[in-house]
Amino acid sequence: MIELKNVSKVFTTKKVNVEALKSTSLQVKKGEVFGIIGYSGAGKSTLIRCVNLLEKPTTGNIIVNNQDLTTLSAKELAKARQKIGMIFQGFNLLKTVTVYENIALPLRLAGIPKTEIEKRVEKYLRIVDLFNRKDAYPSELSGGQKQRVAIARALSHEPEVLLSDEATSALDPETTDSILDLLLKINEEIGITILLITHEMNVIQRICDRVAVMEHGAVIESGTVKEIFTNPQHVTTKKFVNSAFAAKIPAEVQKELQRTGEIVTLSFIGNSSGEPALAIATKRFQVYPNILSGNITQLKHEAYGKLVIHMQGEQNEINHALSFLQEQGIIVEGGRTDYGKQVLFG
């Protein structure tokens, strides 16, 4: 559906060349929600703007819907872009026309017949639950409603791909959740492929199937959301994963606790998140866990929980208890023995 082959982008100024995107290859499957996450300056905005050639790559190939966009003429590219919708952080609505006209006007410019325009505007305004505001002006809408209009406008061209450039960054948490729910609904009901960029891990965990982590213009790690959450490899990826969980244990507290036991992180995925494995381990072995912090969150299709505990007891009993927890499908990290990679607490 979307494939980037060795794509790079260099911005040239009078004094210096800035390599915003290093040789990057990426594949997004048809019908999936693929997220790209990174801090400011990571290159994610440059990458997504290269996908529809809003930014022309310096090198490499951009293949969307089996077409290499870098080889198309201006006329062919304009036609190909009609199948690539895009939404932005800033909404980009026309302030002087109504909600209806914000969607209808681009369709008129594309030569769509009047009856078809009327049908599409109503259809997609109903999908985003804003048909009753079709005669309102953007100034009369909330931020979330403006983004819903932008989504309806992008969908009205009936694209096969939807690009989302930090579409929820300007919204409050509650509105962000409603927009993410809408994007998930669109993906599941229409089957549209979504490629989004964000700096917020909650966006990734809520709706994405797979994710790529970017830093300094390059993809440093990628995989399914489940893989990234349960087994992050790069230090930056670990920071993003830990940002989804509020608690941090100060270094001095860690040092003090490690004198009397082990600090261990238990990660639960899917069905294991509801099993009383820790309680069973406590009864079966002579160990005494003290819960330091814990959280459970929802990935796209399954629960994921993380529990940080201070476990006391004889070392042999602790080892048996942690082995038992692993046998129950729980990921064990930290401690003095080799149960997994040490997690980052702060």
UniProtKB/Swiss-Prot annotation:
InterPro entries: AAA+_ATPase, ABC_transporter-like_ATP-bd, ABC_transporter-like_CS, ACT-like_dom_sf, MetN_ABC, MetN_ABC_transporter-like, NIL_domain, P-loop_NTPase. Keywords: Amino-acid transport, ATP-binding, Cell membrane, Membrane, Nucleotide-binding, Translocase, Transport. ATP binds at residues 38-45. Residues 2-241 form the ABC transporter domain. It is a peripheral membrane protein. It comes from the Bacteria. It is found in: Cell membrane. Its EC number is 7.4.2.11. It is an enzyme of class 7 (translocase). Its main location: membrane. GO terms for cellular component: plasma membrane. PROSITE patterns: ABC_TRANSPORTER_1, ABC_TRANSPORTER_2, METN. GO terms for molecular function: ABC-type D-methionine transporter activity; ATP binding; ATP hydrolysis activity. It catalyses: L-methionine(out) + ATP + H2O = L-methionine(in) + ADP + phosphate + H(+); D-methionine(out) + ATP + H2O = D-methionine(in) + ADP + phosphate + H(+). CDD domains: ABC_MetN_methionine_transporter. The keyword Transcription regulation does not apply. The complex is composed of two ATP-binding proteins (MetN), two transmembrane proteins (MetI) and a solute-binding protein (MetQ). Part of the ABC transporter complex MetNIQ involved in methionine import. Responsible for energy coupling to the transport system. Belongs to the ABC transporter superfamily. Methionine importer (TC 3.A.1.24) family. This is Methionine import ATP-binding protein MetN 1. It comes from Bacillus cereus (strain ATCC 14579 / DSM 31 / CCUG 7414 / JCM 2152 / NBRC 15305 / NCIMB 9373 / NCTC 2599 / NRRL B-3711).
